[in-house]
């Protein structure tokens, strides 16, 4: 070749989740978290979701992870949990209501920030 350049398309590197070209990342993530949490609440209950959210927040604070990455970690964990739950065969017909949620109406969770969709 005269130019010395390879005419083939360059092999992409590792795709960064933050580089995806769609609506602003924070708006997309917030909308997805709300939808995911509404579905997850029917199968796992607020207490468990608050515990997962708190875990992601505490791990992120410990490692200095930005808030958006913490929220995305929570999203991935809950999404995987729902996948496994459905894969094992969900037999639930009613929303999840553990004793604590019926007793005081709130469930657990002492998070500084509430996961989107669980307000």
Swiss-Prot record:
Subcellular location: Virion; Host nucleus
Region span, Disordered: 98-119
One GO biological process term: viral life cycle
Primary subcellular site in the record, as a coarse category: virion
Record's GO cellular component terms: host cell nucleus; virion component
One Pfam family, short name: VPR
Keyword Iron-sulfur: no
Gene3D superfamilies named in the record: 1.20.5.4730
Disulphides: none
InterPro entries associated with the record: Lentiviral_Vpx_assoc_factor, RetroV_VpR/X
Keywords carried by this UniProt record: Host nucleus, Host-virus interaction, Inhibition of host innate immune response by virus, Viral immunoevasion, Virion
More info: This is an African green monkey isolate.
Function, in words: Plays a role in nuclear translocation of the viral pre-integration complex (PIC), thus is required for the virus to infect non-dividing cells. Targets specific host proteins for degradation by the 26S proteasome. Acts by associating with the cellular CUL4A-DDB1 E3 ligase complex through direct interaction with host VPRPB/DCAF-1. This change in the E3 ligase substrate specificity results in the degradation of host SAMHD1. In turn, SAMHD1 depletion allows viral replication in host myeloid cells by preventing SAMHD1-mediated hydrolysis of intracellular dNTPs necessary for reverse transcription.
Stated family: Belongs to the lentivirus VPX protein family.
Assembly and oligomerization: Interacts with the P6 region of unprocessed GAG. Interacts with host VPRBP/DCAF1, leading to change substrate specificity of the CUL4A-DDB1 E3 ligase complex.
The protein's name: Protein Vpx
Organism placement in taxonomy: Viruses, Riboviria, Pararnavirae, Artverviricota, Revtraviricetes
